[in-house]
Amino acid sequence: MPPHVTLVNPPSPSGCTGHWSITLLGLGYLAAVLEKNRYEVDVIDCQALNISFEEVKNELRKRQPDVIGLTSTTLTYKSALHIIKIAKEVCPNCLTVIGGSHVTFWDDKALQECPQLDIVVRKEGENTLLELMQKLEAGKSFGDVLGITCRKDGKIVKNPDRPYIEDLDSLPFPARHLWPLDQIRKIEDIFYLTTSRGCTFWCEFCAAVRMFGRRFRMRRPKNVVDELEYLHNTYGATNFTFCDDAFTVDQSRTEELCEEIMKRKLKIKWNCGTRIDMLTKELLIKMKEAGCISVWSGVESGAQQILDAMKKGISVEQTIRVFGWLRELGLKTAPNVILGFPGETKKTAWKTITFVEKISPDYVGFYNIATPFPGTPMYDYIMEKGWLRVTDFDKYDTATPIFETPMLSMKELKEIREQAFHHFYLRPTYILRMFAKGGMHGLSATRTALEHLLKSIKLKLQRL
Protein backbone atom coordinates (compact mmCIF):
# COMPACT_ATOMS: atom_id res chain seq x y z
CA MET A 1 0.00 0.00 0.00
CA PRO A 2 1.46 3.43 -0.94
CA PRO A 3 2.61 5.55 2.03
CA HIS A 4 0.26 8.22 3.36
CA VAL A 5 1.73 11.71 3.75
CA THR A 6 0.57 14.60 5.91
CA LEU A 7 2.10 17.97 5.05
CA VAL A 8 2.16 20.59 7.80
CA ASN A 9 2.58 24.36 7.73
CA PRO A 10 3.60 25.18 11.34
CA PRO A 11 2.21 28.19 13.21
CA SER A 12 4.01 31.50 13.46
CA PRO A 13 4.96 32.75 16.93
CA SER A 14 2.20 34.55 18.81
CA GLY A 15 1.65 38.08 17.52
CA CYS A 16 3.35 37.45 14.18
CA THR A 17 1.54 37.56 10.86
CA GLY A 18 1.92 34.26 9.05
CA HIS A 19 2.62 34.08 5.34
CA TRP A 20 0.38 31.06 4.91
CA SER A 21 -0.80 32.17 1.49
CA ILE A 22 2.72 31.96 0.08
CA THR A 23 3.45 28.74 1.96
CA LEU A 24 0.40 27.21 0.29
CA LEU A 25 2.35 27.35 -2.97
CA GLY A 26 5.37 25.46 -1.60
CA LEU A 27 3.38 22.72 0.10
CA GLY A 28 0.85 22.82 -2.73
CA TYR A 29 3.47 21.90 -5.32
CA LEU A 30 4.77 19.07 -3.12
CA ALA A 31 1.26 17.72 -2.64
CA ALA A 32 0.47 17.98 -6.35
CA VAL A 33 3.57 16.01 -7.35
CA LEU A 34 2.77 13.30 -4.80
CA GLU A 35 -0.87 13.09 -5.88
CA LYS A 36 0.18 12.86 -9.52
CA ASN A 37 2.18 9.79 -8.52
CA ARG A 38 -0.83 8.28 -6.71
CA TYR A 39 0.23 8.90 -3.12
CA GLU A 40 -2.36 9.77 -0.47
CA VAL A 41 -1.77 13.33 0.74
CA ASP A 42 -3.48 15.63 3.21
CA VAL A 43 -2.56 18.97 4.75
CA ILE A 44 -2.62 20.66 8.15
CA ASP A 45 -2.14 24.41 7.72
CA CYS A 46 -1.79 25.88 11.20
CA GLN A 47 -1.49 29.45 9.96
CA ALA A 48 -4.42 29.47 7.56
CA LEU A 49 -6.84 28.10 10.16
CA ASN A 50 -5.11 29.19 13.39
CA ILE A 51 -4.63 25.60 14.54
CA SER A 52 -2.97 24.99 17.93
CA PHE A 53 -0.27 22.44 18.74
CA GLU A 54 -2.82 20.36 20.64
CA GLU A 55 -5.11 20.30 17.61
CA VAL A 56 -2.18 19.24 15.41
CA LYS A 57 -1.42 16.44 17.84
CA ASN A 58 -5.03 15.23 17.75
CA GLU A 59 -5.14 15.40 13.95
CA LEU A 60 -1.93 13.40 13.58
CA ARG A 61 -3.13 10.82 16.09
CA LYS A 62 -6.33 10.46 14.06
CA ARG A 63 -4.71 10.37 10.59
CA GLN A 64 -1.69 8.18 11.46
CA PRO A 65 0.37 9.12 8.37
CA ASP A 66 3.46 7.17 7.35
CA VAL A 67 5.32 10.39 6.54
CA ILE A 68 4.97 13.83 8.12
CA GLY A 69 6.51 16.63 6.08
CA LEU A 70 6.91 20.18 7.33
CA THR A 71 7.99 23.41 5.74
CA SER A 72 9.96 25.93 7.75
CA THR A 73 10.96 29.55 7.52
CA THR A 74 13.28 31.04 10.11
CA LEU A 75 10.28 32.43 11.96
CA THR A 76 8.45 29.08 12.12
CA TYR A 77 11.52 26.91 12.74
CA LYS A 78 10.95 26.38 16.47
CA SER A 79 7.27 25.63 15.90
CA ALA A 80 8.21 23.08 13.23
CA LEU A 81 10.59 21.24 15.57
CA HIS A 82 7.92 21.19 18.28
CA ILE A 83 5.45 19.58 15.87
CA ILE A 84 8.05 16.97 14.91
CA LYS A 85 8.41 16.05 18.58
CA ILE A 86 4.62 15.85 18.91
CA ALA A 87 4.44 13.72 15.77
CA LYS A 88 6.78 11.08 17.16
CA GLU A 89 4.67 10.87 20.33
CA VAL A 90 1.48 9.94 18.48
CA CYS A 91 2.99 8.36 15.34
CA PRO A 92 6.20 6.77 16.66
CA ASN A 93 6.91 4.87 13.44
CA CYS A 94 6.38 7.76 11.04
CA LEU A 95 9.17 9.29 8.96
CA THR A 96 9.64 12.98 9.82
CA VAL A 97 10.88 15.24 7.04
CA ILE A 98 11.43 19.00 7.00
CA GLY A 99 12.25 21.38 4.16
CA GLY A 100 12.26 25.07 3.35
CA SER A 101 14.65 27.98 3.16
CA HIS A 102 15.71 28.01 6.81
CA VAL A 103 16.61 24.34 7.24
CA THR A 104 18.35 24.27 3.86
CA PHE A 105 21.08 26.32 5.55
CA TRP A 106 20.53 24.95 9.07
CA ASP A 107 20.32 21.26 8.18
CA ASP A 108 22.97 19.77 10.44
CA LYS A 109 21.93 21.97 13.36
CA ALA A 110 18.27 20.99 12.92
CA LEU A 111 19.18 17.30 13.19
CA GLN A 112 21.35 18.01 16.23
CA GLU A 113 18.65 20.06 17.95
CA CYS A 114 15.82 17.60 17.24
CA PRO A 115 16.55 13.86 17.65
CA GLN A 116 13.00 13.13 16.46
CA LEU A 117 13.76 14.64 13.03
CA ASP A 118 14.75 12.03 10.44
CA ILE A 119 15.51 13.90 7.21
CA VAL A 120 16.13 17.47 6.03
CA VAL A 121 15.29 18.21 2.40
CA ARG A 122 17.43 21.02 1.03
CA LYS A 123 16.47 23.54 -1.67
CA GLU A 124 13.72 22.45 -4.11
CA GLY A 125 11.77 19.60 -2.59
CA GLU A 126 9.39 18.20 -5.20
CA ASN A 127 11.59 15.52 -6.76
CA THR A 128 13.45 14.80 -3.53
CA LEU A 129 10.29 14.12 -1.53
CA LEU A 130 8.91 12.00 -4.36
CA GLU A 131 12.05 9.85 -4.40
CA LEU A 132 11.91 9.47 -0.62
CA MET A 133 8.35 8.20 -0.95
CA GLN A 134 9.34 5.77 -3.68
CA LYS A 135 12.23 4.44 -1.58
CA LEU A 136 9.97 4.07 1.45
CA GLU A 137 7.34 2.23 -0.56
CA ALA A 138 9.97 -0.12 -2.02
CA GLY A 139 11.62 -0.69 1.37
CA LYS A 140 14.93 0.70 0.12
CA SER A 141 17.58 2.82 1.83
CA PHE A 142 17.56 6.63 1.56
CA GLY A 143 21.35 6.65 1.47
CA ASP A 144 21.76 7.73 -2.15
CA VAL A 145 18.92 10.27 -2.34
CA LEU A 146 20.26 13.60 -3.57
CA GLY A 147 19.40 16.82 -1.76
CA ILE A 148 18.96 15.45 1.76
CA THR A 149 20.78 15.62 5.07
CA CYS A 150 20.20 12.71 7.45
CA ARG A 151 21.81 10.43 10.02
CA LYS A 152 23.83 7.37 9.12
CA ASP A 153 25.53 5.16 11.71
CA GLY A 154 25.05 7.87 14.32
CA LYS A 155 26.62 10.60 12.18
CA ILE A 156 25.01 13.43 10.24
CA VAL A 157 25.51 12.94 6.50
CA LYS A 158 24.94 15.61 3.87
CA ASN A 159 24.26 14.10 0.44
CA PRO A 160 25.15 16.10 -2.69
CA ASP A 161 22.66 18.70 -3.92
CA ARG A 162 19.94 17.66 -6.34
CA PRO A 163 19.95 19.42 -9.73
CA TYR A 164 17.28 22.08 -10.08
CA ILE A 165 14.07 21.38 -11.99
CA GLU A 166 14.75 22.82 -15.44
CA ASP A 167 11.25 22.59 -16.91
CA LEU A 168 8.91 24.27 -14.43
CA ASP A 169 6.01 23.63 -16.82
CA SER A 170 6.40 19.94 -16.00
CA LEU A 171 5.15 20.58 -12.47
CA PRO A 172 1.41 20.16 -11.86
CA PHE A 173 -0.46 23.18 -10.51
CA PRO A 174 -0.43 23.41 -6.69
CA ALA A 175 -2.98 21.11 -5.03
CA ARG A 176 -5.07 23.96 -3.66
CA HIS A 177 -8.09 21.64 -3.26
CA LEU A 178 -6.42 20.20 -0.14
CA TRP A 179 -6.89 23.55 1.62
CA PRO A 180 -10.24 24.80 3.01
CA LEU A 181 -10.43 27.56 0.41
CA ASP A 182 -13.92 28.67 1.43
CA GLN A 183 -12.64 29.56 4.89
CA ILE A 184 -9.39 31.04 3.61
CA ARG A 185 -11.15 33.25 1.07
CA LYS A 186 -13.19 34.85 3.85
CA ILE A 187 -9.89 36.15 5.19
CA GLU A 188 -8.28 37.05 1.87
CA ASP A 189 -9.86 36.38 -1.52
CA ILE A 190 -6.62 36.34 -3.49
CA PHE A 191 -4.98 33.43 -5.28
CA TYR A 192 -1.17 33.34 -5.33
CA LEU A 193 0.97 32.07 -8.18
CA THR A 194 4.66 31.86 -8.94
CA THR A 195 5.97 31.89 -12.50
CA SER A 196 9.72 31.55 -12.00
CA ARG A 197 12.48 30.39 -9.68
CA GLY A 198 16.02 31.56 -9.17
CA CYS A 199 17.68 34.94 -9.45
CA THR A 200 20.68 36.49 -11.19
CA PHE A 201 21.23 39.15 -8.53
CA TRP A 202 23.11 38.82 -5.27
CA CYS A 203 21.45 41.14 -2.76
CA GLU A 204 23.20 40.83 0.59
CA PHE A 205 19.96 40.36 2.56
CA CYS A 206 18.47 37.62 0.36
CA ALA A 207 19.05 33.85 0.09
CA ALA A 208 17.26 33.33 -3.25
CA VAL A 209 20.45 32.62 -5.20
CA ARG A 210 21.70 30.05 -2.70
CA MET A 211 18.24 28.49 -2.46
CA PHE A 212 17.16 28.40 -6.12
CA GLY A 213 20.30 29.06 -8.16
CA ARG A 214 21.84 32.08 -9.87
CA ARG A 215 19.73 32.13 -12.99
CA PHE A 216 16.06 32.51 -13.74
CA ARG A 217 14.04 29.44 -14.64
CA MET A 218 10.70 30.55 -16.02
CA ARG A 219 7.37 29.00 -16.85
CA ARG A 220 6.08 29.67 -20.33
CA PRO A 221 3.35 32.34 -20.56
CA LYS A 222 0.81 29.83 -21.86
CA ASN A 223 1.36 27.56 -18.86
CA VAL A 224 0.93 30.48 -16.45
CA VAL A 225 -2.27 31.69 -18.10
CA ASP A 226 -3.54 28.10 -18.17
CA GLU A 227 -3.31 28.18 -14.38
CA LEU A 228 -5.01 31.58 -14.17
CA GLU A 229 -7.82 30.33 -16.39
CA TYR A 230 -8.16 27.10 -14.39
CA LEU A 231 -8.47 29.04 -11.12
CA HIS A 232 -10.91 31.48 -12.70
CA ASN A 233 -13.12 28.71 -14.07
CA THR A 234 -12.86 26.36 -11.07
CA TYR A 235 -13.09 28.77 -8.15
CA GLY A 236 -14.41 31.95 -9.75
CA ALA A 237 -11.12 33.61 -8.86
CA THR A 238 -10.63 37.16 -10.13
CA ASN A 239 -7.84 38.49 -7.88
CA PHE A 240 -4.29 37.21 -8.19
CA THR A 241 -0.81 37.91 -6.86
CA PHE A 242 2.35 36.85 -8.66
CA CYS A 243 4.89 36.03 -5.95
CA ASP A 244 8.02 36.04 -8.09
CA ASP A 245 11.01 37.95 -6.73
CA ALA A 246 11.31 39.68 -10.12
CA PHE A 247 8.16 39.12 -12.18
CA THR A 248 9.29 41.29 -15.10
CA VAL A 249 12.85 39.97 -15.39
CA ASP A 250 12.19 38.96 -19.01
CA GLN A 251 10.24 41.83 -20.57
CA SER A 252 9.29 39.93 -23.73
CA ARG A 253 7.92 37.04 -21.64
CA THR A 254 5.92 39.46 -19.50
CA GLU A 255 4.47 41.10 -22.62
CA GLU A 256 3.58 37.69 -24.04
CA LEU A 257 1.91 36.73 -20.78
CA CYS A 258 -0.15 39.94 -20.82
CA GLU A 259 -1.15 39.34 -24.43
CA GLU A 260 -2.23 35.78 -23.56
CA ILE A 261 -4.43 37.07 -20.72
CA MET A 262 -6.09 39.56 -23.08
CA LYS A 263 -6.38 37.01 -25.88
CA ARG A 264 -8.40 34.73 -23.59
CA LYS A 265 -10.49 37.70 -22.42
CA LEU A 266 -9.86 36.90 -18.76
CA LYS A 267 -11.52 39.56 -16.61
CA ILE A 268 -9.09 39.50 -13.73
CA LYS A 269 -7.10 41.84 -11.50
CA TRP A 270 -3.57 41.12 -10.43
CA ASN A 271 -0.50 42.55 -8.77
CA CYS A 272 3.13 41.58 -8.85
CA GLY A 273 6.48 42.23 -7.29
CA THR A 274 9.54 43.13 -9.28
CA ARG A 275 12.75 45.12 -9.39
CA ILE A 276 12.74 48.83 -10.14
CA ASP A 277 15.33 48.38 -12.90
CA MET A 278 13.17 45.82 -14.71
CA LEU A 279 10.29 48.13 -15.58
CA THR A 280 9.65 50.39 -18.54
CA LYS A 281 6.71 52.69 -19.06
CA GLU A 282 5.69 50.71 -22.15
CA LEU A 283 5.68 47.45 -20.19
CA LEU A 284 3.61 48.99 -17.39
CA ILE A 285 1.03 50.17 -19.93
CA LYS A 286 0.77 46.62 -21.30
CA MET A 287 0.49 45.18 -17.78
CA LYS A 288 -2.33 47.56 -16.90
CA GLU A 289 -4.21 46.61 -20.07
CA ALA A 290 -3.98 42.97 -18.96
CA GLY A 291 -5.44 43.64 -15.51
CA CYS A 292 -2.49 44.72 -13.36
CA ILE A 293 -3.65 47.09 -10.63
CA SER A 294 -0.58 47.42 -8.40
CA VAL A 295 3.15 46.82 -8.29
CA TRP A 296 5.21 46.26 -5.17
CA SER A 297 8.95 46.70 -5.40
CA GLY A 298 12.08 46.53 -3.34
CA VAL A 299 12.96 50.19 -2.95
CA GLU A 300 14.93 49.16 0.16
CA SER A 301 16.60 52.53 0.88
CA GLY A 302 16.65 56.18 -0.10
CA ALA A 303 20.38 56.43 0.58
CA GLN A 304 22.52 55.40 -2.38
CA GLN A 305 25.42 54.29 -0.18
CA ILE A 306 23.13 51.83 1.60
CA LEU A 307 21.75 50.51 -1.71
CA ASP A 308 25.33 49.97 -2.84
CA ALA A 309 26.22 48.20 0.42
CA MET A 310 23.22 45.91 -0.14
CA LYS A 311 24.48 45.19 -3.68
CA LYS A 312 20.97 46.00 -4.82
CA GLY A 313 22.06 47.25 -8.22
CA ILE A 314 19.54 50.10 -8.49
CA SER A 315 19.74 53.86 -8.05
CA VAL A 316 17.60 56.34 -6.17
CA GLU A 317 16.99 58.14 -9.48
CA GLN A 318 15.57 54.97 -11.06
CA THR A 319 13.08 54.61 -8.22
CA ILE A 320 11.90 58.21 -8.59
CA ARG A 321 11.41 57.77 -12.34
CA VAL A 322 9.52 54.46 -12.07
CA PHE A 323 7.23 55.68 -9.29
CA GLY A 324 6.41 58.65 -11.49
CA TRP A 325 5.28 56.27 -14.25
CA LEU A 326 3.24 54.18 -11.82
CA ARG A 327 1.48 57.25 -10.45
CA GLU A 328 0.85 58.61 -13.97
CA LEU A 329 -0.71 55.30 -15.05
CA GLY A 330 -2.86 54.97 -11.94
CA LEU A 331 -1.16 51.80 -10.70
CA LYS A 332 -1.05 51.44 -6.92
CA THR A 333 2.39 51.29 -5.35
CA ALA A 334 3.71 49.60 -2.22
CA PRO A 335 7.49 49.80 -1.73
CA ASN A 336 9.30 47.43 0.58
CA VAL A 337 11.90 49.23 2.66
CA ILE A 338 14.72 47.95 4.86
CA LEU A 339 16.00 49.93 7.83
CA GLY A 340 19.14 49.14 9.81
CA PHE A 341 21.27 47.41 7.18
CA PRO A 342 24.98 47.35 8.16
CA GLY A 343 26.32 50.84 7.50
CA GLU A 344 22.99 52.49 8.34
CA THR A 345 23.07 55.58 10.56
CA LYS A 346 20.28 57.74 11.94
CA LYS A 347 20.97 60.13 9.08
CA THR A 348 20.66 57.54 6.30
CA ALA A 349 17.59 55.99 7.95
CA TRP A 350 15.80 59.33 8.00
CA LYS A 351 16.93 59.97 4.46
CA THR A 352 15.04 56.80 3.52
CA ILE A 353 11.94 57.83 5.46
CA THR A 354 11.78 61.23 3.75
CA PHE A 355 12.52 59.57 0.40
CA VAL A 356 9.52 57.26 0.78
CA GLU A 357 7.36 60.31 1.39
CA LYS A 358 8.83 61.95 -1.71
CA ILE A 359 7.89 59.07 -4.02
CA SER A 360 4.45 59.12 -2.35
CA PRO A 361 3.33 55.48 -2.54
CA ASP A 362 -0.24 54.42 -1.85
CA TYR A 363 0.96 52.18 0.96
CA VAL A 364 4.21 51.30 2.63
CA GLY A 365 4.53 47.57 2.05
CA PHE A 366 6.87 47.19 4.99
CA TYR A 367 9.41 49.18 6.93
CA ASN A 368 11.41 46.01 7.52
CA ILE A 369 14.16 45.76 10.08
CA ALA A 370 17.27 44.34 8.40
CA THR A 371 17.26 40.71 9.52
CA PRO A 372 20.22 38.34 9.02
CA PHE A 373 18.46 35.15 7.95
CA PRO A 374 20.69 32.06 7.73
CA GLY A 375 21.75 31.53 4.14
CA THR A 376 22.10 35.22 3.33
CA PRO A 377 25.45 36.96 2.80
CA MET A 378 24.33 39.44 5.47
CA TYR A 379 24.10 36.64 8.04
CA ASP A 380 27.68 35.61 7.30
CA TYR A 381 28.85 39.23 7.62
CA ILE A 382 27.01 39.86 10.91
CA MET A 383 28.42 36.66 12.41
CA GLU A 384 31.92 37.57 11.26
CA LYS A 385 31.61 41.00 12.90
CA GLY A 386 30.16 39.58 16.12
CA TRP A 387 27.17 41.94 15.97
CA LEU A 388 24.39 39.37 16.46
CA ARG A 389 22.46 39.95 19.68
CA VAL A 390 19.29 37.85 19.26
CA THR A 391 19.45 34.10 18.59
CA ASP A 392 15.78 33.28 19.29
CA PHE A 393 14.36 32.66 15.81
CA ASP A 394 10.85 33.49 17.08
CA LYS A 395 12.04 37.12 17.00
CA TYR A 396 13.15 37.04 13.35
CA ASP A 397 9.93 38.72 12.20
CA THR A 398 11.57 41.71 10.38
CA ALA A 399 9.95 43.99 12.96
CA THR A 400 12.42 43.28 15.77
CA PRO A 401 16.09 44.38 15.77
CA ILE A 402 18.35 41.33 15.79
CA PHE A 403 21.80 42.91 15.71
CA GLU A 404 23.42 46.24 16.35
CA THR A 405 26.38 48.02 14.85
CA PRO A 406 28.73 50.68 16.21
CA MET A 407 26.68 53.20 14.19
CA LEU A 408 23.16 52.24 15.26
CA SER A 409 21.91 50.53 18.42
CA MET A 410 18.94 48.17 18.52
CA LYS A 411 16.98 50.64 20.66
CA GLU A 412 17.62 53.47 18.20
CA LEU A 413 16.60 51.31 15.26
CA LYS A 414 13.34 50.24 16.91
CA GLU A 415 12.42 53.86 17.63
CA ILE A 416 13.27 54.95 14.08
CA ARG A 417 11.00 52.25 12.63
CA GLU A 418 8.09 53.27 14.84
CA GLN A 419 8.58 56.90 13.87
CA ALA A 420 8.76 55.96 10.20
CA PHE A 421 5.24 54.49 10.22
CA HIS A 422 3.84 57.41 12.21
CA HIS A 423 5.55 59.88 9.88
CA PHE A 424 4.07 58.23 6.79
CA TYR A 425 0.49 57.67 7.89
CA LEU A 426 0.07 60.99 9.73
CA ARG A 427 0.90 63.08 6.67
CA PRO A 428 -2.02 65.34 5.70
CA THR A 429 -1.38 64.51 2.03
CA TYR A 430 -1.87 60.79 2.70
CA ILE A 431 -5.07 61.28 4.69
CA LEU A 432 -6.52 63.70 2.13
CA ARG A 433 -5.68 61.36 -0.72
CA MET A 434 -7.45 58.46 0.97
CA PHE A 435 -10.47 60.64 1.71
CA ALA A 436 -10.55 61.73 -1.92
CA LYS A 437 -10.99 58.06 -2.84
CA GLY A 438 -14.07 58.00 -0.62
CA GLY A 439 -15.83 55.17 1.18
CA MET A 440 -13.75 52.69 3.14
CA HIS A 441 -10.49 54.30 2.02
CA GLY A 442 -11.34 57.44 4.01
CA LEU A 443 -12.47 55.49 7.07
CA SER A 444 -9.39 53.29 6.90
CA ALA A 445 -7.11 56.32 6.60
CA THR A 446 -8.75 57.94 9.63
CA ARG A 447 -8.40 54.78 11.72
CA THR A 448 -4.78 54.26 10.65
CA ALA A 449 -3.88 57.90 11.32
CA LEU A 450 -5.46 57.79 14.79
CA GLU A 451 -3.62 54.58 15.65
CA HIS A 452 -0.29 56.07 14.68
CA LEU A 453 -1.07 59.37 16.40
CA LEU A 454 -1.72 57.55 19.68
CA LYS A 455 1.44 55.47 19.28
CA SER A 456 3.44 58.60 18.48
CA ILE A 457 2.16 60.37 21.61
CA LYS A 458 2.92 57.28 23.72
CA LEU A 459 6.45 57.11 22.30
CA LYS A 460 7.09 60.77 23.15
CA LEU A 461 5.71 60.35 26.69
CA GLN A 462 8.04 57.41 27.28
CA ARG A 463 11.00 59.69 26.59
CA LEU A 464 9.96 62.30 29.18
Q: What residue ranges belong to the model's regions?
A:
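Radical SAM [4Fe-4S] cluster-binding motif and immediate context
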Residues: 169, 173-341, 346, 351-354
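Proline-aspartate-enriched helix->loop->beta-strand connector
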Residues: 64-68, 237, 361-362
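N-terminal [4Fe-4S]-dependent radical SAM core
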Residues: 2-3, 11-14, 145, 150-195
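Radical SAM enzyme core and accessory elements
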Residues: 1-7, 40, 57, 66, ...
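Structural recognition of alpha->loop->beta junctions
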Residues: 109-127, 289-296, 351-366
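Glycine-rich beta-alpha loop elements in corrinoid/cobalamin-binding modules
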Residues: 4, 20, 33-167, 368-375
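Glycine- and acidic-residue-enriched helix-capping/strand-helix junction motifs
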Residues: 14-27
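Flexible glycine/acidic-rich beta-alpha junction loops that bind and position SAM and/or redox cofactors
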Residues: 14-16, 107, 201, 251-252, ...
